[in-house]
């Protein structure tokens, strides 16, 4: 019996058989340990709400008021409190259990603009600061430690720095990591593209589940360990399990548990650019799409603003196996003056990632779909044939590169730009607003001339203190 922790929408699941044997006339297949089916929720999400002995209306009011002060600060809107209490009391009057009524009241608070929308931050109001920090870093309410500190008065910069670093270490920060990474890197749209089973028959449900987890765990590790910002471009660590390692061609990782893995330089992996989650979602599921990938690198990592394509120019999706090579097709497209400016910026980044297919695997040659007759039926060998050799070379800002490693080396020369863009993205996430010119100048001043030693948590802390202490919006 296999128990899944969440409903499964797919009518069937495919697991890759890792071992098979015949015993007493029966075939036995092993698919390894399915740790994916175990609830990975942090411990605090597994707490149970216990109904108190006294379930009177007065206790209901006391709990809601205490929660409101913690979630919204010491001085929550009285009208919101009254509305929450009224909904909870009406639920009790209708015969609902105490906990059901309480949840209805608390839901009213959590769905209110006061909680969901970014409030005006008063750095002199300690409880307001506590609520703001918890909302940003935990997507939750402050804990007792934070409340105690802020009740003694406004936090100075050093105290605030200490609290931010402590909160990043807490397991509750994983909610922020998932939300922030989903918005910044586009992982919220990870499920929108699925690699074709004709071209990538080994792509299965387990791999689909673990690919984004690698990225989330990697980013959480950078933040909690305060690793340097250059790990975004290239890194010697990642988080893998056996299924991911097999997909990447990395040996020595056994079991379904995700764990930190030291990457060999020969693995072609390291940093965000070579993660399967990024590589998969920047394709159409068939082709690797250097234009889509290049646009992603340019916008999400480098921070280059991209204007919308001209309305009169048709979309280009280059295909392999045609008379013209992939680069020739793109170069023909960019002969038009209206297209040349943007493609000059984005295409080189995409060319550097051509050694990875639409499922995120390393490749030496392109795959093209092999024509077949009849209705499509899944088969392990797929429906493809090998085509032209991959060309991952290009020119970036006048400097040539031959592959992903040499392109990364060029990107590291622009590390200050990467760090500055990350600061802007984190500011936007924390404040709920794009930085103004004044704020962009302040953010730029936070980046040293040599950002290779700039810690991720250090930069996030500086930006967050600026959001709270220097808020003039």
Explain the meaning of each model-derived region.
Residues 1-54:
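Aromatic, loop-rich ligand-recognition surfaces of beta-strand-rich domains
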């Amino acid at each position: 019996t296999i128990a899944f922790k969440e409903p499964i929408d797919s009518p069937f699941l495919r697991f890759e058989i890792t071992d098979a044997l015949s015993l007493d006339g029966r075939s036995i297949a092993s698919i390894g340990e399915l740790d994916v089916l175990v609830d990975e929720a942090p411990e605090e999400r597994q707490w149970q709400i216990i109904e108190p002995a006294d379930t009177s209306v007065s206790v209901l009011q006391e709990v809601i008021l205490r929660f409101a002060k913690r979630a919204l600060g010491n001085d929550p809107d009285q009208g919101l409190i009254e509305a929450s209490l009224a909904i909870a009391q009406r639920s009790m009057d209708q015969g609902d259990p105490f906990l059901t009524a309480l949840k209805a009241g608390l839901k009213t608070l959590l769905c209110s603009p006061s909680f969901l929308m970014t409030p005006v931050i008063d750095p002199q109001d300690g409880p307001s600061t506590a609520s703001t920090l918890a909302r940003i870093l935990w997507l939750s309410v402050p804990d007792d430690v934070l409340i105690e500190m802020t009740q003694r008065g406004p936090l100075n910069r050093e105290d605030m720095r200490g609290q931010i670093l402590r909160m990043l270490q807490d397991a509750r920060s994983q909610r922020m990591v998932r939300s922030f990474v989903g918005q910044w890197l586009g992982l919220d749209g990870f499920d929108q593209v699925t690699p074709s089973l004709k071209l990538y028959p080994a792509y299965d449900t387990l791999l689909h589940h673990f690919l984004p987890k690698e990225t989330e765990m990697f980013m959480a590790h950078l933040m909690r360990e305060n690793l340097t910002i250059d790990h975004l471009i290239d890194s010697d660590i990642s988080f893998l399990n056996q299924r991911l390692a097999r997909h990447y061609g990395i040996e020595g990782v056994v079991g379904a548990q995700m764990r930190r893995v030291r990457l060999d330089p020969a693995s072609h992996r390291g940093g965000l650019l070579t993660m399967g989650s990024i590589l998969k979602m920047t394709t159409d599921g068939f082709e690797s799409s250097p234009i889509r990938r290049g646009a992603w690198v340019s916008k999400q990592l480098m921070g280059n603003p991209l204007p919308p394509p001209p309305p009169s120019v048709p979309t280009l999706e280059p295909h392999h196996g045609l008379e013209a090579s992939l680069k020739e097709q793109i170069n023909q497209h960019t002969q038009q003056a209206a297209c040349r400016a943007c493609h000059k910026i984005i295409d080189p980044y995409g060319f550097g990632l051509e050694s990875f297919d639409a499922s995120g695997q390393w490749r030496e040659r392109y795959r093209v779909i092999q024509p077949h007759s009849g209705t499509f039926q899944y088969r392990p060998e797929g429906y493809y044939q090998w085509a032209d050799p991959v060309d991952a070379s290009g020119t970036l800002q006048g400097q040539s590169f031959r592959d992903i490693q040499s392109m990364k080396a060029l990107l590291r020369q622009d590390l200050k730009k990467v760090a500055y863009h990350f600061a802007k993205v984190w500011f936007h996430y924390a404040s709920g607003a794009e930085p103004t010119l004044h704020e962009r100048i302040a953010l730029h001043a936070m980046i040293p001339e040599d950002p290779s030693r700039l810690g991720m948590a250090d930069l996030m802390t500086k930006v967050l203190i600026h959001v709270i202490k220097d808020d003039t919006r």
